[in-house]
Amino acid sequence: MGADSQVHKTARKFYTSFSNWDTYRTQTALIAMLAPEETSDIVMSHYLFAEQSGGGFPRWVLANIETGVMQGDPTPILVANAYAFGARTYDPRTLLRTMRYGAEVPGANSQGVLTRPGLEQY
C-alpha cells in the first residue's frame, strides 16, 4: 500500500516505518557503507512516499502514515548521507528536485504534514 492508500508495484524493494529524525545522522551512513543496494532502496522508498503523499519528504513514517512528530527536515540529510557513503543506484537529480521542493515551496507536504512549517516566514 502506498502513501496515497493505493496499491503500487515497484521495481525495487520498498521499505516503510522510518524514524528519520533518530537515524539520519549516523545509522544511514553506516548502512550505506555496509549495504549500499538496500540503502538505495530505502532512499527510493522515501522518494516514492513523497511522490505519493504530496511531494514533500516524510520525516517519521509509521505503517505508511506520516506521523508528523519531531521537528526539522531530516530526510534530505538522510539522502545526502546515503549518497556520500555509497548508496548510489538511483538518479540523485531526481532526489535533489524533491529536496529543493521541500526547501523552497511553502506548503510542500507529506500526507498533509508540512515539510518545513514556517517556511513562508523565511
Question: Residue locations for each model-derived region?
Answer:
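Short acidic, glycine/Ser/Thr-rich loop/turn "cap" segments at secondary-structure junctions
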Residues: 11, 25-28, 60-65
